[in-house]
Amino acid sequence: MAAVDVSYRIEGRGPALYLVHGIGSRKTTWDEIIDGLKDRFTCVSYDLRGHGDSPIPPTPYSLEDLIDDLEALRQKLGHDRVHIAGHSLGGMIGPAYARAYPRHTLSVGLLSTAAGRSEDDRAKLQAVGNAMEQNGIAETLGTFVARWFTDAFIAAYPDQIEARLQQVRDTPADVFLGVFWIYATTEMAPWLHEVKCPCLVLTGEFDGGCNPRLNEFIHGELPDSRLVILEGLKHSLMIEASDRVLPHLREFLLEQDTD
């Protein structure tokens, strides 16, 4: 499938940092992170194909399609070498891009993503996908909330929970299911060792699907990485705790050679 001319936004100045959101999300999920980085980095956030303001080509999509979209955007904007940070599915797109285009990749942030899944991990994802296909995405939204956010955040910020759920509702069902299956079936274990650039691996202590065990595996497979586990958090780190993600991401990025 041909690359899609995705909707994007650029803020800041300095070395280019491309920010890649996850399933059923939007480029706006990075807003608070961008506010803390745009003094030193040219922050490029974009909507994945089929999401937000980007075109909606016919499904199914593949991980390679999503990599092609990122490469097309890099070429369009003319950045030779870029940092990439991705969340969840975006945390798979980033290292996969770095593997395909090592010359153009300065570093990768893998936030709340997964590799080295066990048979039980894969079975749980299969069950979630099957439930969405059989019962509809709307019927599973309640289970997503419990996976994505802590109980305290759910109680304190119902408007933010509803806004995130509305993003899911506004994503075409075939797109949401399609990118879920990309996330569920992608296994980075066979090739993570090929990603040679510096990497930040970060997740929440209580993220069920992208848990510390899986991120410790990622950290161990990458030749040059650091691991951060944020205590008490689940999956939606940028919504619930961008103030805790930002210092680690900023420190990591500033330490890289940006010449």
Language-model regions: role of each:
Residues V195, V201-T203:
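Short beta-strand/loop motif that positions the catalytic acidic residue
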